[in-house]
Every structure is written in C-alpha cells, then in structure tokens.
Curated annotation (Swiss-Prot):
InterPro entries found in the cross-reference section: 6-hairpin_glycosidase_sf, 6hp_glycosidase-like_sf, Glyco_hydro_9, Glyco_hydro_9_His_AS
Active site (record annotation): 86 (nucleophile), 413, 465, 474
A GO BP annotation: cellulose catabolic process
Keyword annotations of the record: Carbohydrate metabolism, Cell wall biogenesis/degradation, Cellulose degradation, Glycoprotein, Glycosidase, Hydrolase, Polysaccharide degradation, Secreted, Signal
Glycosylated residues (UniProt): 6
Superkingdom, natural source: Eukaryota
Any one GO cellular component localisation term in the record: extracellular region
Family assignment from sequence similarity: Belongs to the glycosyl hydrolase 9 (cellulase E) family.
Record has Secreted as a keyword: yes
Catalytic activity: Endohydrolysis of (1->4)-beta-D-glucosidic linkages in cellulose, lichenin and cereal beta-D-glucans
Record-given protein name: Endoglucanase 12
Signal sequence interval, chain numbering: 1-31
C-alpha cells in the first residue's frame, strides 16, 4: 500500500515534470519564433529597397536599381521602397508604411532595443524618410509616384535591369493631393519623434517638412489621384479627411502645439465607427492617438475628445469579439476583414491592440465593451493570438511569413524574388521573357524573400501558394510595417 502510493506520487511528479518541460520547450520555441520573425521582418525592408544599396546591405541577392529616378524632372528621387511585388514607388502607401514603422519605433522602442533590433528598425525607417525628404523639394510640391503602374505590371522584370518607364509624378498647388500630403506629413511627424532621441537635427528637418506638408494639404484640398491619375487604378484614395486628422494628431504629439489639437477638436467629425485601419483609412489611427491623450489626462476627456476615444474603443471591442459589430474570424481564429491581402488589416488591428494595451496599463484603465470588459492583458493576448496564427498556429500549419519555420509560402508574387539574382546571372530579363521563364515557372522562387508577409488565407483558412494568386500571395510593405511593432510587443 505504502509502496503503491509512493510509486503513484513519483509517477504523478514525473508526469508534471514532463508537462512543465514540454510547456517550457513550447514557450521557448514560440519565443525563438518571435525573435526570428522580428529579425526577418526588418530584412524584408532591405529586399524592398530601391536605389543605391549601402555597403552593409544584408540581403545580398538584391542589387542597385532605379538609379536615374527623378531625372525626367531634374531631381534626385532615388531610394525609397518598392511597394509590393512590383517595381513601383507609390508615395501614398509608402508614406503609410513610414508612419507605421515610426509608430512601431515610438511605442515599442524599449522592446526593440531589448531584442537588439532598434538599430535595424531605425535604419528601415530612415531609408523611407530620406526618400520622402527628397520627394518634398518645395513647401507646395511633393512627388508621389515614380514609374507607370500599367506598363510596370505588364512586365515581369527584376528591378536591377527593368526597362519600363520611370516617370516622376507630383502634386502641387495647381494639382493638389491633400490625402498624399497629409499622410506624408504624418509620416514625417511620427518619424521625427522616433529619431529625436538619437539625432535631434534630423528630427528637426523632418518636423519642418511635416509642418509644410500639413499646411499644403489644408490650403489646397483635393484627392491626389485626380492629379496623379496613374495612381488611381492601384492606390486610389477614398477621401482626405482621415489623413488630415492623422497628420494633425502626429504633429500635435511631435510638437505639443495647440493649433494641431484645435484642428482635431474643431473638425466636423471624428470618422465615426470604422471597420478597418489601413493605407486608405487612418481614422482609427487618429482616434487611438486622441484616446491616448485622454487616458493620460493631458486633455479633457469630454466632448470631441471623448468621441475619438469612444470610436477607438469601439474598433477594439469589435476586434476582441465583444462589440456590437464584431470583426469576422476564420474557423482557425484569424481576424478576417477583406479578401485581398487580408493580413494588412490583421497586422494593423493587432498593432492597435498592442499599443492600446500599453496605454491602458499606464493609465490603470480598462475598456467597457457592449459584451464585457477588456483589460490591457486581454488586448495583448488577442494580438499574440494573431501573431501565433500568422507564424504557423493555424489549420494549414503554415507560417505566412516567408522564411520563418519550414512550411511557408515558396512562391510569393514578387518580381525580384522570383527571378534569378542579377549577382548570379547578369543576362537581361525581358518584359515578356520574365513571364515565360520565371512567372510561369512551377518551381519555388530562387530568392527567399525573408520576412515578407503574404496576403494570407481566405475566410476558410485556405491558402494557395501560387504566383498567379496575387490577392493571397503578394507581400506588401504596408502589411509588414505594423507587424514589426506587434512582434516586439508580444515577444
């Protein structure tokens, strides 16, 4: 009897030890996965670089490209990022990418530093802001696109030896674009905050551009695609009110100047309840920044400020499945917004949850949703669940970040990655030849696009790993930029 009881006790203790060990190993694996994903998410931006590559370039299968950008307008427009799987520089999504990279550095700076990625993250940000500075040569002039979308998309070529037109397009007082100017102002203002602790002079340059761009956007209202018509078929803007609020919120945070807060409180509306936060809809971003001010008690939390906060928290409640109009979830648990590149919306929503979790923690506050309360820890856990899904905890057992894990997309829709590196084979790739030899090639891409996030699975958790499946298989900078911050937050 005694022996049996002792044996049972030993068996129980052994079982507990095994469970604890397995759980510990699982946590270690997840933690390592987060570290790998964070590192590779920043490598992705190196693969998207346009222009003269620096000596410390780590993605060595890429080469210099588009070294004459801007020459048609007698201006240097080299640098910046290609937006997705093509060879285009679209200023509207590029500016949003920049703002989200900056926000990641601002809110998760200490985490990025702890994970030894702050330097890489700031370098990714500066590659974008250096270009945006070039693109804004005069207060009321902003270059918003390089390349022609239609001709670029008709060809499947490497950026290093592409022969498609590199036309420079701009907005100015006679050809306005409040949305483009407003988003670029937001990017410059946010980046100025990120760089201020390290390079005050550079931060001051950025804030000067941000102020000029915001003034330009207000003084000369208009949709940018009416001036840069070529952009309309690719990144058309649905309005510019959100960009102006977003820019004002960032300028207020960067300068603490009352005139920007006045703009926000005197605006005709706060954007109302939103269903997404993305490159064409920044209302949620502005609402969250204003809610932060209210939580910090830096402004009165009634009237217009209270409305911003209410709208921000309504979006969060819906993402947490505790709202009145909840975001759809796939059977596997992914927040599902829209079919085309759904992960761009998942990563921005996850960023909002991660950032707001920090705001609530600092304020010792919670959110009262229609279907229950949310604590700061709840928000971070939801964000972590989305990261885990994206990195492989899903019905497909697939990581949707290229190069992370063993089962990840092998054929993302991406010209540079799908064609042999110019460093290995300098034979020119022609417009149609690229389609014949590389686009239609059933083999995996010859270059691994480390850290890229594809568009992701459909509403039933199904993903098709084919280059032709661009709605699911094309990565974009707007998807990865917020994910940098989320990865740092959930680590």
């Amino acid at each position: 009897m005694s022996q049996s009881k002792n044996g049972s006790s030993q068996c129980l203790w052994t079982s507990i030890c095994i469970v604890v060990l397995v759980m510990s190993m699982a946590r270690g694996a997840v933690s390592t996965n987060y570290a790998e994903a964070l590192q590779k998410s920043l490598l992705y931006f190196e693969a998207q670089r346009s222009g003269k590559l620096p000596p410390n370039q780590k993605v060595t299968w890429r080469g210099d490209s588009a070294l004459k950008d801007g020459s048609d307008a007698h201006i240097d427009l080299t640098g910046g990022y290609y937006d997705a799987g093509d060879n285009m520089k679209f200023g509207f999504p590029l500016a949003f990418t920049t703002t989200m990279l900056a926000w990641s550095n601002i809110e998760m700076g200490s985490e990025l530093r702890a994970h030894h990625e702050q330097g890489n993250s700031l370098r990714a940000l500066k590659w974008a802001t250096d270009y945006l500075i070039k693109a804004h040569p005069q207060p009321n002039v902003l270059y918003g696109q390089v390349g022609e979308g239609n001709s670029d998309h008709k060809c499947w070529m490497r950026p290093e030896d592409m022969t498609t037109p590199r036309t420079s397009y701009r907005i100015d007082a006679q050809h306005p674009g409040s949305d483009l100017a407003g988003e670029t102002a937001a990017a410059m203002a946010a980046a100025s905050i990120a760089f201020a602790p390290f390079d005050k002079a550079y931060a001051n340059i950025l804030i000067g551009h941000a102020k000029d761009l915001f003034a330009f956007a207000k003084a000369h209202p208009g949709l940018y695609q009416n001036s840069i018509t070529n952009a309309g078929g690719f990144y058309a803007s649905s309005g510019y009110e959100d960009e102006l609020l977003w820019a004002a919120a960032w300028l207020h945070r960067a300068t603490n100047d009352q005139i920007y807060l006045n703009y926000l409180t005197q605006a005709s509306g706060t954007g109302g309840p939103r269903s997404v936060f993305a490159w064409d809809d920044k209302f949620v971003g502005a609402q969250v920044l204003m809610a932060k001010l209210a939580l910090e008690r830096k402004v009165g939390s009634n009237g217009k400020i209270a409305e911003y906060k209410s709208m921000a928290e309504q979006f969060i409640c819906n993402c947490a499945q505790k709202g009145s109009n909840n975001v759809k979830k796939t059977p596997g648990g992914l927040l599902y917004f829209l079919p085309w590149n759904n992960l761009q919306y998942t990563t921005t929503a996850s960023f909002v949850l991660s950032a707001y979790s920090k705001y609530l923690t600092k304020a010792k506050a919670s959110i009262q949703c229609p279907k229950g309360a949310l604590q700061a820890s709840d928000l971070l856990q939801i964000a972590r669940s989305q990261v885990d899904y994206i990195l492989g905890s899903n019905p497909q057992k697939m990581s949707y970040m290229v190069g992370v894990g063993t089962n990840y997309p092998k054929k993302p829709h991406h010209r540079a990655a799908s064609i042999v590196s110019i460093r290995k084979d300098k034979t020119p790739v022609t417009c149609s030849g690229g389609y014949d030899k590389w686009y239609n090639n059933p083999a995996p891409n010859p270059n691994v696009l480390m850290g890229a996030l594809v568009g992701g699975p459909n509403e039933n958790d199904v993903y098709g790993d084919e280059r032709s499946n661009f709605q699911q298989a094309e990565p974009a900078t707007v998807t990865v930029a917020p994910f940098v911050g989320v990865l740092a937050a959930v680590f």
